[in-house]
Amino acid sequence: MKVDKRKLEIAMARAKLNRDTLARKADMPIPTVCNVYSRGSCKPATVGRIAEALGIDVTEILAD
């Protein structure tokens, strides 16, 4: 799934999380979150876990 980096950054800022704390909250390795952030894509389950950790709907961080 394509993740919009800007939307992800905004959601992280709203939740007051950096990549490390997001990874811990999503219960996934830090490199996984960094890869999503840099590549802009990931598996549906991964984006779902990130959205859940941010307390948002997954559609809020998907690319248009």
Spans of features found by a protein language model:
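Short, basic-rich loop-to-helix N-cap that marks the start of a DNA-contacting helix
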Residues: 39-52
